Amino acid sequence: MQVLVRDNNVDQALRALKKKMQREGIFREMKMRGHYEKPSEKRAREKAEAVRRARKLARKRAQREGLVSGRPAAAR
């Protein structure tokens, strides 16, 4: 990964690098590789992530169709 440093502005270059790494998912992968994850734990995590994605998609779809308001339930 490469970031240009313009006018010796290292802080701006570091922010750009961090943003690129965040977008690529490098921080998340480093966290996951920090310790061994058993295959059963990996399956459970991936299944939970899939359920979370499906719920989010259903919520967005319902919101688009006007069935649910965009505000969270606690704010009502």
From Swiss-Prot:
It comes from the Bacteria. Residues 35-52 have a biased composition (Basic and acidic residues). One of its GO terms (biological process) is translation. Residues 35-76 are annotated as: Disordered. GO terms for cellular component: ribonucleoprotein complex; ribosome. One of its GO terms (molecular function) is structural constituent of ribosome. Pfam families: Ribosomal_S21 (PF01165). Keywords: Ribonucleoprotein, Ribosomal protein. Residues 53-62 have a biased composition (Basic residues). Belongs to the bacterial ribosomal protein bS21 family. PANTHER family: MITOCHONDRIAL 28S RIBOSOMAL PROTEIN S21 (PTHR21109), SMALL RIBOSOMAL SUBUNIT PROTEIN BS21M (PTHR21109:SF0). HAMAP family: Ribosomal_bS21. This is Small ribosomal subunit protein bS21A. It comes from Chelativorans sp. (strain BNC1). The lineage of its organism: Bacteria, Pseudomonadati, Pseudomonadota, Alphaproteobacteria, Hyphomicrobiales. The gene is rpsU1.
